[in-house]
Amino acid sequence: MAAAPSATAPKHNYTLGTNASQLELYKYLKTVPPIPELRQAVTIKKYEEASVDDTLYPLIDEHQIIMVVGAFFGDEGKGKTVDAVARHPACTCVARVNSGENAGHTVFDDIGRKYVFNLAPSSLLTPNTRNYVSSECVMDPISFMEREIGQFIKSNMPYKDKLFVGNVFVVTPYHKLLDLLGSAPNSSTLKGMSPIHASKVTKRGIRLDHIFNDEGVLRARLAKDMDTYYGLLKVKGLTDKDVVRRCEEENADGVERVPGYVVDFARAENKIDYLVKLYTERVKNNKDFPRRCDVTHELRAALARGEKLLLEGPQSYWLSNAREKFWESTTSADTTAGGLLASAQFNFQRYKVLVINVHKAPGSSRVGIGANPSSFVPQDYYSAQDIKTLEALPKGGCVDFDKIQNFFYTKAFNTESKTFNGIYEPLEYEDATGKYNIGVAMSIASARHHGECGAVTKKPRVCGFFDCVLHFEVNAVQGPYLSISAVDRGDDYDRIGITIAYVYYDVGNKMVDANGRVYKNGDIIKAGDPVPCEMALYHCYPIVKVINGWKGAPIAASKRRPNEPLPKGVCEFIANVEFFTGAKVISIGNGPRGSDIIYLKQ
């Protein structure tokens, strides 16, 4: 059990072992009365496997616009569902319509070659699709060419007739430096998202078309927008040499978080000349740059012809800047289903829209900073200790995942007790490297065992329980259809936990006023109750329902026969998620390949 960070001063002396503050916290939390839902009987349906033709395709047939969106904090494994939808015969167009390269997904072609996409739609390798990056997206065209298009050039994979780019907002090197210099350590992807969206809403900066037109206008707009960059340097008392040094420090561990051309910009004496030359040579006069078009017009025309359109959602519902609850720690675009539809600029009265939410469990995760009530450790546990990659985790510590998860679910959760209230005891797990708070051990072991690190940042993700409190709202806004990825991870668990409620507790007995409701110690927030703002969520702890696992009856595609009955534990997990959230689970992931999906008979 980890003490919550303060919303105003989230600096802590975190420890590996259980400390006095955690023991003091548990001293109170163990007195919280059990809520009836912990013992409430949930009807366990017999979920049966069906084909994609009998489950997903009929849904697609009934709609013109299909959206695949994240339902938690990103990194849910959306690419697999995107690929499945894109392979529908009538789905001809796939588009990214907002946000930028702060997303990340890995796909493999038919001969096993690996491609990593950040802004380009992940269906670029899917036959018979046209792929678009819409004008409401933000793009660093240099990074886009180097990291994404460069993969196609290197492998001689044609893309000119499959990928089209609209008049995007241009992320410049100074946007990325503003991100680096202005963000708290380990709190950002360093892709310049906040600064470019600030330029966007203040109508400064440049769009892609500016690079292809009058150079004088291009120079003037860049100069005006760079006032913010120079202003930050002045306020912080930084020189160009200081900025270069900061970039080198960020890249010192071998992970290039600040690209070379961004460092060169910081070194450049005449920065406007540097940018104009950079964009002229590597964008305007670059024969390899993708074809440009009015994406909105092309997509509307496709819909008018009766074609189906897939909108690929970046990030997720709770990382959307339009969501009040986590506003301080979100991305800078509206990445909800409604935000995607608005960015696409369609007449929503004319078309039927299908939304498929994607979540991940076990091992639901988040990167960055902010509140995360269902996590094993506070969300800033790694960032506060400057742990930037999985390799920086305690060497040799918490490597026995099987032993740790068993200890966690059978010892820390005393489910046999009549007074069990869904809150685990902060016991210590010990291995050859020392003693670990069980939440810390579970967090480290989960990150290692499941390879949970950011697709963009490489930072270890903070793992936790499937959060029914948060998903209830997602389902209310853009449900009911839900695909849960990585369920085959449950093959390695004796039991599975899901969060069905929170309890509010502040060690200083402080109350939080959120939307007129005052939250005080002992208040319970259940699935279906209003979700408070982050100021309150920092002091919320998960009430966990523990479900029997299915260890010994694996569902992983490499071990399971097709159409084999699903284990009782899997059915119990799905039934509880549906019961507490109102969602309708249409598929579960059971392996790393795109085809490793079990569709559920509807």
Curated annotation (Swiss-Prot):
SMART domains reported in the protein's UniProt record: Adenylsucc_synt (SM00788)
S-S bonds: none
Molecular-function GO terms, alphabetical: adenylosuccinate synthase activity; GTP binding; magnesium ion binding
Pathway annotation from the record: Purine metabolism; AMP biosynthesis via de novo pathway; AMP from IMP: step 1/2
Positions annotated as active site in the UniProt record: 75 (proton acceptor), 105 (proton donor)
Binding site for GTP: 74-80, 104-106, 461, 589-591
Catalytic reaction(s) noted: IMP + L-aspartate + GTP = N(6)-(1,2-dicarboxyethyl)-AMP + GDP + phosphate + 2 H(+)
A cellular-component GO term for this protein: cytoplasm
A UniProt-annotated Pfam family: Adenylsucc_synt
Residue positions binding IMP: 75-78, 102-105, 189, 203, 315, 331, 459
Binding site for substrate: 455-461
Keywords: Cytoplasm, GTP-binding, Ligase, Magnesium, Metal-binding, Nucleotide-binding, Purine biosynthesis
Main location: cytoplasm
Subcellular location: Cytoplasm
Cofactor note: Binds 1 Mg(2+) ion per subunit.
Binding site for Mg(2+): 75, 104
Gene Ontology BP terms: 'de novo' AMP biosynthetic process; IMP metabolic process
Cofactor: Mg(2+)
Enzyme Commission number: 6.3.4.4
Miscellaneous comment as given in the Swiss-Prot or TrEMBL entry: Parasitic protozoa lack the de novo purine biosynthesis pathway and rely exclusively on the salvage pathway for their purine nucleotide requirements.
PANTHER family: ADENYLOSUCCINATE SYNTHETASE
Function description: Plays an important role in the salvage pathway for purine nucleotide biosynthesis. Catalyzes the first committed step in the biosynthesis of AMP from IMP.
Family: Belongs to the adenylosuccinate synthetase family.
Quaternary context: Homodimer.
Protein name: Adenylosuccinate synthetase
